[in-house]
Amino acid sequence: MVSIMPKILYNPEVLGHKPKSYHVENPERVLTILNSLKSNGFDDIVLIEGKSTINEILEIHSRDYVYSIINLSKSFNYYDGDTYLCDRTLDAALTAFKLAKEAVKLALKDRDLYFALTRPPGHHAGISGRALGAMSNGFCIFNNIAGAARLAKNYMKKVIIIDFDVHHGNGTQEIFWNDNRVIHIDFHQRGIYPGTGDILDIGGEEAKGTKINLPFPAHSTDADYIFAWNEIVEPILNYFSPDTVLVSAGFDAFINDGLASMDLTETFYRFVGAKLSGYSVTAVLEGGYSIGLKYAPPAFLDGYVDAKDVLDNLEDYTVINSNEVKSMVKNVKKIIGEYLDIF
């Protein structure tokens, strides 16, 4: 149980990244979350001034990629078929990067939850843009969670990133592929963009077992996700007991959110918040495009604040109906168990 309410880190500069015509990744996403959080009593909004420097971005991304973004964002352009830029994109992206880093600084100081409202999102952006052979950047510019994780490495032996966005965090995984100090656990829908995240993708030669992919079939449910969390994530958190848990918080696995085919409800997000209540949390916004933005973020924070009540009233998810998910989880435990003596 935490002592104070979660804090939401925000800077209106992130609204400056705008499409010319309708695009699912638009400023309304952040405003929807803000309004929903406030209406549910989460109104501790912290305005973070300023933005990161180009040199900070170059700690994560290649020079060629960063300067291509700088040049393209001088006017309205497309980096690829999915990812637009405008004359305020660079400032928005540098601001988002700073929000993520400020969140982890605060979380390392106080054992509470800090939720950075970052956009453009970041987890698909790899070292040089498109990551692990993906066809596009998937709306992402700079990898915000990677910036937070790199900073956290200065204070922690092991950094744990949990990504529950419905799309695989291929950029994050590429950036830390050979880094055995960063454990990246990724929940995602199998067979959709970016087409990465197989259970056999476990990290580079010196980092095998630190990249943990959980590819779920379409229409997976709260029960499926909770089962996987209890079987895989919980033992890892218990073993490493990190000073802060980094979360790539995408809400597009929510049922009918629009860009995927998952059937999650508030139950899973409330469960995750409750399970993380014993830790400080650095949450960084990734995806979520419609209904998920309204209902999932307040559920996530509510679980963190009211953990005991949430977990005491949770249904028994030790048994699930999906043989596909049970098999996937069993195989992941077997593969990762060869490198991490946890399961």
Swiss-Prot record:
Q: Name one GO biological process term.
A: epigenetic regulation of gene expression
Q: Could you give a GO molecular-function term held by this entry?
A: histone deacetylase activity
Q: Which Pfam families match?
A: Hist_deacetyl
Query: Which InterPro entries does this UniProt record tie to the protein?
Result: HDAC_PDAC, His_deacetylse, His_deacetylse_dom, His_deacetylse_dom_sf, Ureohydrolase_dom_sf
> Which keywords has UniProt assigned to this entry?
Hydrolase
| Origin superkingdom | Archaea
Keyword check for Nucleus: no
What the record says about family reads: Belongs to the histone deacetylase family.
Protein function = Putative deacetylase.
User: Under what name is this protein listed?
Assistant: Uncharacterized protein MJ0535
Organism listed in the record: Methanocaldococcus jannaschii (strain ATCC 43067 / DSM 2661 / JAL-1 / JCM 10045 / NBRC 100440) (Methanococcus jannaschii)
